[in-house]
Amino acid sequence: MAEAVFHAPKRKRRVYETYESPLPIPFGQDHGPLKEFKIFRAEMINNNVIVRNAEDIEQLYGKGYFGKGILSRSRPSFTISDPKLVAKWKDMKTNMPIITSKRYQHSVEWAAELMRRQGQDESTVRRILKDYTKPLEHPPVKRNEEAQVHDKLNSGMVSNMEGTAGGERPSVVNGDSGKSGGVGDPREPLGCLQEGSGCHPTTESFEKSVREDASPLPHVCCCKQDALILQRGLHHEDGSQHIGLLHPGDRGPDHEYVLVEEAECAMSEREAAPNEELVQRNRLICRRNPYRIFEYLQLSLEEAFFLVYALGCLSIYYEKEPLTIVKLWKAFTVVQPTFRTTYMAYHYFRSKGWVPKVGLKYGTDLLLYRKGPPFYHASYSVIIELVDDHFEGSLRRPLSWKSLAALSRVSVNVSKELMLCYLIKPSTMTDKEMESPECMKRIKVQEVILSRWVSSRERSDQDDL
C-alpha cells in the first residue's frame, strides 16, 4: 500500500458569495470589540431537525454551510416572486414579492380549501377571504425601531463568552435559546402602482403616511396534527394550529404582503373610442397573501449534533422541552441506526476544516468540500466503516469487487477521489460505552484513498524510466 498523493481541491469557476467567518467564534470585523456567543434554536419534528427563525437560518448556513433549505437545493433562497415580473418592475426597488394575478388566485383557492377542511361554512370562508384579500392603500415601509429592538431581544439567548484556560465541554443540557420568532408588526397598505408611473413604494411621502391595519381577523384553528405545514406551524397548548392566512408570521413584510400585477382598462380611451379595442395597462396592487409558504432550514442529524456537542451553539427542542446531549445521542441513534458511525466521521472531518455533506448523489456516505459548496467542488467521496483493532467486524455495506469498481469509476468521472474511512474501535470497548458521545475519545481513524490501477499507464511510466 503506497502513500496517497494529495490533490489540491478544484475551485469553481464562478463564485457568487463571499466567505464568512465560521461558527462559533466571530471575527472582529463582524461584531466589533464586543464578541457575543449566540445559542440558536431548532426543533425536532417528525425525526427531522428544523430551524425556523430567519436570523438563525442565515447565520447557520452562512457561517459553516450547515443544513439546506427545505424548498431550495442548498442555501434557503425560496421566493414566490415571478422572475419575469421582478425584471419588468426592477425600478420599483421593493422587497415585496411580485406575482401574477393567476398565482394570487391560486393562493386564494388554497386558503379557501384549507378553511373548508377545518369545518368552516362557505359564507364564512367568502367573508374572511373578501376582507383579507382586499386592496391596500399605502406601502408597508421599513419596520419601526421598536419592533426591531423587540425582534433582536427575542431572536435568541445571547451570552458573553468568557475565556478559559482550556476548552470546556458544553453543559449536559444543550442550551436554551429565546423565542425563535420575531414579533408580528403592523403593516401598511399600498396603493395601485401603475406601470411607468412615478409612484415609488419607499419614497419619503409614503413613509409619513404609515398607519396600522385596524381590522384584525379572527383566528381559525386547524384540527390536524401535522407538525410542519406550509403555513406557520405554531402549536397552541391544546395541540391545535393556526393557519398562515390569519396568523402574522415573523418573516417580515415579504411574506405578509405581495404585489399583484393586474390589468386595468384606460377609461379615457374607452370614452373617446367606444368601438375600438380597449387599451389595458398593468399595475401593481398590494394585497395580503392568504396562503403563505415559509422555507425552513433542515439540518442533518450529524450537523445538528455537531452544533450541539462540539460547538455548543444550538439548542434542540422536542415538544417545547430542550434535549440533553445524551438524549440526543440516543434519540438520533434510534432514528438512524448508523448515526454513531457517520457522526464520528463527520466530527473528524469537520474538526479538520472540511465541510462534509451527504454523499448519496454519488453512492457514498459523505462528500468533503473545502470552505463550502459555493467555492470548491467536492474533493473526496467517503465511505465510512466501523471496525475493531484487526479491521474486522460487521460492515455497514459489504463491498464486492464489482461494486467497489463501480464506485471508483463514478468518483473518477466527477473528478473526486474515493476514500475509505475506517473508524477503529478498541476491542475492549463495550456497548454501554457507545451510548455516550464520550466514546469518540477512544476511536482512531484510518483514511485509505482508493485509486484504479491502469496497466497501460504503468507500462508507459516504466518505459519513460
UniProtKB/Swiss-Prot annotation:
EC number assigned by the record: 4.6.1.16
Active site annotation, chain numbering: Y369, H377, K416
Protein name as catalogued: tRNA-splicing endonuclease subunit Sen2
Gene Ontology CC annotation, any one: tRNA-intron endonuclease complex
Tissue specificity of this protein: Isoform 1 and isoform 2 are widely expressed at very low level.
UniProt cross-references to Pfam families, sorted A to Z: tRNA_int_endo, tRNA_int_endo_N
Species for this entry: Homo sapiens (Human)
Gene this protein is translated from: TSEN2
Primary site of residence: nucleus
Membership in a protein family: Belongs to the tRNA-intron endonuclease family.
Residues passing through the membrane, by range: none
Catalysed reactions listed for this entry: pretRNA = a 3'-half-tRNA molecule with a 5'-OH end + a 5'-half-tRNA molecule with a 2',3'-cyclic phosphate end + an intron with a 2',3'-cyclic phosphate and a 5'-hydroxyl terminus
